[in-house]
Amino acid sequence: MIRWLLLMYLGITCQGVTDIHSRNLTNSLKVIYEWKYIDYDFGSDEKRQAAIQSGDYNYTMNYLLDTDQWGDKTFVIIMKFNGVPSSLNVITNKTGNGGPLLAPYPDWTWAKNENCSGITSAYKIEIDMCDRLWVLDSGLINNVRSVCPPQLLVFDLNTSQLLKQVKIPHDIAVNTTTEKGALVTLSVQLLSCEVNGSTLVYIGDNEGFALIIYNNSDNSFQRLTSSTFASDPRYTTFTINGESFTLQSGIFGMALSPLTQNLYYSALSSHNLNYVNTEQFVKSQYQANNVHYQGKENILWTQASAKGISDNGVLFFGLVGDTSLACWNENRLLDRRNIEVVAKNKETLQAITGLKVKRRISFILVHGFPLEYEYVLAVSNRIQKVIYGFDFNDVNFRILIANVNDLIKNTRCISP
């Protein structure tokens, strides 16, 4: 009897691990783009050589970070280091020796940011249901040096015209006590399609440990602080495919649930999963020192990176040390037993730094109407190789895709 109870207990607590081994998760995500190194469509070989000679382009310093899709366009973010000609780009239909060539968005003039009027260092992007591209520009070069104020930019994707450009004040962008700040993640809460409508944008400061709320209707900012935004010193060592590095990082990935209006987040250097309900922010019924943050400490077995969420409340997130993608359904108890690994690949999932859940129209017609389904779009980039060195003869950067329903089939991420 005791032995049976023990086995039953182990079966419950280790159920996720058992399921992982019983399912083939290696090819759950399909690679749709891949690069050995990042290169651009400069317009001519002469212009490309000039960019190399001037130092504007150095292929060894270009690292893929984020992505999003709209129509036939796939947008990509390249971390802004010296040698990166453009941080906000689209993938062209041209291919170089490293992979598909990129082109700056909206055009090259925006990438040449000599007076801080263009784009310095796009870090994260999000496309809303009103065909608008929201761009978070950290203003940082080499991830540390601030050369321009951070800003939010909004583009009309139908015309590629700028709708709005808002500089983020210094006392909002940094922790005024430590003077540290790095605005590296965002989530858009669409409330209106009007240019100056009451859309809210949530921005994570992963060095100053804060959550920033931008109100599009009046261009106001609010900086919130909480211990849940801070890194945990126990989890500042990251190991990816046997290579370790140290990083003290706060909020990195966020996802806003369309079902509950919960904003899910976690400090990158932690094993936690947290959330805050945004209804109080929408109704302006809150005080900065009286916001209720919820979540679970040490619910994860490794650090969580980028996040995305489906319309019916399935939260997806990258697991750094596990080289995997996991999910949890917010209709279930927030408990480790309800977290499922749905994709795992030591080769193709080394550090998921960008993640979106998108809606696509299928060519399949049901009763005369096109079938709509959701898919996961992910970036993996071997980020540890920034320290250990990339082999540019090997594939280093990937964009992957999978149908949401296929990923969660026969898992606890299906709604109860």
From Swiss-Prot:
Induction: Unlike many other major royal jelly proteins, not down-regulated by the ecdysteroid 20-hydroxyecdysone (ecdysterone or 20E). InterPro entries: 6-blade_b-propeller_TolB-like (IPR011042), Royal_jelly/protein_yellow (IPR017996). One of its GO terms (cellular component) is extracellular region. Glycans are attached at residues 24, 58, 93, 115, 158, 175, 196, 215. Gene3D superfamilies: TolB, C-terminal domain. SUPFAM superfamilies: NHL repeat. It is found in: Secreted. Keywords: Glycoprotein, Secreted, Signal. Residues 1-16 form the signal peptide. The keyword Signal applies. Expressed at very low levels in the hypopharyngeal glands of worker honey bees (at protein level). Secreted into bee venom in the sting apparatus (at protein level). Expressed in the spermatheca of adult queen bees (at protein level); expression levels are higher in mated queens than in virgin queens. Along with Mrjp9 expressed at very low levels in the head of worker bees compared to other major royal jelly proteins. Component of bee sting venom. Component of royal jelly, a substance produced in the hypopharyngeal gland containing proteins, free amino acids, fatty acids, sugars and other nutrients, which is fed to developing larvae by worker nurse bees; may be present only at trace levels. All larvae are fed some royal jelly (also known as worker jelly) early in their development but it forms the principal source of nutrition for larvae destined to become queen bees. Belongs to the major royal jelly protein family. This is Major royal jelly protein 8.
